[in-house]
Amino acid sequence: MTLSSGEPSAVGGRHRVVIIGSGFGGLNAAKALKRADVDITLISKTTTHLFQPLLYQVATGILSEGDIAPTTRLILRRQKNVRVLLGEVNAIDLKAQTVTSKLMDMTTVTPYDSLIVAAGAQQSYFGNDEFATFAPGMKTIDDALELRGRILGAFEAAEVSTDHAERERRLTFVVVGAGPTGVEVAGQIVELAERTLAGAFRTITPSECRVILLDAAPAVLPPMGPKLGLKAQRRLEKMDVEVQLNAMVTAVDYKGITIKEKDGGERRIECACKVWAAGVAASPLGKMIAEGSDGTEIDRAGRVIVEPDLTVKGHPNVFVVGDLMFVPGVPGVAQGAIQGARYATTVIKHMVKGNDDPANRKPFHYFNKGSMATISRHSAVAQVGKLEFAGYFAWLAWLVLHLVYLVGYRNRIAALFAWGISFMGRARGQMAITSQMIYARLVMTLMEQQAQGALAAAEQAEHAEQEAAG
């Protein structure tokens, strides 16, 4: 079934803006056009606006998924010039100026006058996608809930294990990737074990768990520089996190992981719970855009190499923002997406008023507001311009910044309350786990494989019938 979400603009009709994605770039673009004389269609494959920087707190039981992922439709319900569509974009026709999305068996074709592509990024396993079965990433709510099930489930399995080696394996946690997400996850697993779970088991001592932070790079938090990276590493090591650098993961399976050292030697770590926080790849829409335009290229991560005004070459009405765009010096962080969205919407407002000259647009300029990473309760590292600081005040700055960027007063109050319980005491309010959290991904993968197998068999049978008839 194919539906149309709008007709081509009549002469003098309202300008139609299509936004793909409901992350930082997509949501901020929609809100920035609130008072503009435009009709907006926001298309997203999820129903929520996800605050990704706090996913690790969902995985470690501090926050609920609702605290960091309010419903996009409800956020924008008072903005009457926005329509929200749930669906996965499977085609962008730059010549016809349409976006095709699919939800179940329904296909929707949405025309546009201006397009903002803010589809974000996904976890990258550097060509080893089979690792995902045993080492979930940290990009979606599903990822975070699965990891919560695996982390807490590892302690439960260790409690009933009677084999010493198996118990040690269950209590070994490996986090791959020493960027902000990896550092934060490793620190929170330690705090979960030492504070929240203290005294809750009878045959194991949770604080005796082994937490390993791995990275192929030679330093922790490379983008933040050697000084802050070293401070973060020392703090982690003080918490008994084993920081292992220059260590490349070459294999991941149910029992553990295999690592290749800098000198070429390999070693094995037996572990039950693996967290993949290393590397991102742009949405497949980047490749789709490049293939549909003349002269547009993508980089190795799949990001679109945009023009200075964030547009696709030859298409001054098509903007790419956030993790999907490649602009030298602009990191893949929330601020890059937000600033890119504001720039694109400013240009669109000029277009609507007839004041835009594509050949003379001011280029996008990124203002670096700094970066932060929390390590543990009362400890973080922060970089703001040339200023670098760590410890308690960096942690306070981290708290304030994340509260400001959470969408909605309800979510801010809920997060503040949960943080108060967790940081001033031991408790965490989101410790429930279910079998669905742990096994749903695997079951869905198996079902998809079975469906593909059935489809292939049907196609082969049809082909055989045609040959017999011909």
Curated annotation (Swiss-Prot):
Binds 1 FAD per subunit. The keyword Aminoacyl-tRNA synthetase does not apply. The active site is at residue 184. It is found in: Cell inner membrane. The gene is ndhA. It holds the Pfam family Pyr_redox_2. GO terms for cellular component: cytosol; plasma membrane. Alternative, nonproton pumping NADH:quinone oxidoreductase that delivers electrons to the respiratory chain by oxidation of NADH and reduction of quinones. Its EC number is 1.6.5.9. It catalyses: a quinone + NADH + H(+) = a quinol + NAD(+); a menaquinone + NADH + H(+) = a menaquinol + NAD(+). InterPro entries: FAD/NAD-bd_sf, FAD/NAD-binding_dom, NDH-2. This is Type II NADH:quinone oxidoreductase NdhA. It is a single-pass membrane protein. One of its GO terms (biological process) is biological process involved in interaction with host. Inhibited by phenothiazine analogs. Belongs to the NADH dehydrogenase family. GO terms for molecular function: NAD(P)H dehydrogenase (quinone) activity; NADH:ubiquinone reductase (non-electrogenic) activity; oxidoreductase activity. FAD binds at residues 21-25, 89, 323, 334-335.
